[in-house]
């Protein structure tokens, strides 16, 4: 019997992107059963937590993600197309989000069918 790990994964998080190759290796090398649990990005579920008048937290995440990508030797940039409708200058998140709910739902369905981490 293999070990099971729940992976809470966001389609917008740079950290979810960075960990994906390691998750695939973990599954292959150690017979770990990965259960993908797609979550909505913080920009949608708790935007006031991240996007306040004080932008230092957002600026830190952007710098940290760039440093992490360089350390891992991975290409990194904002997602294109971005699944979140957001002004990247002011970080204002639009009320209407036509993409992320469907995309996250597709991730949930892929996980339900056993194809979450491929």
For each feature predicted by the language model, list its residue ranges.
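Short active-site neighborhood of thiol/selenol oxidoreductases, capturing the structured segment around
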Residues: 2-13
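Structural alpha/beta surface segment adjacent to cysteine/selenocysteine redox centers
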Residues: 11, 17-118
């Amino acid at each position: 019997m293999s070990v099971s790990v729940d992976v809470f994964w966001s389609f917008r998080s740079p950290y979810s992107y960075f960990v994906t190759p390691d998750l695939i290796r973990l599954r292959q090398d150690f017979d770990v059963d990965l259960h993908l649990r797609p979550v909505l990005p913080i920009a949608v579920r708790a935007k006031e937590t991240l996007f306040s008048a004080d932008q230092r937290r957002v600026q830190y995440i952007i710098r940290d993600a760039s440093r992490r990508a360089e350390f891992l030797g991975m290409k990194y940039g904002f997602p294109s197309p971005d699944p979140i409708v957001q002004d990247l200058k002011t970080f204002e998140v639009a009320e209407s989000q036509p993409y992320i709910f469907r995309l996250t739902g597709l991730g949930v369905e892929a996980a339900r069918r056993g194809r979450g981490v491929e």
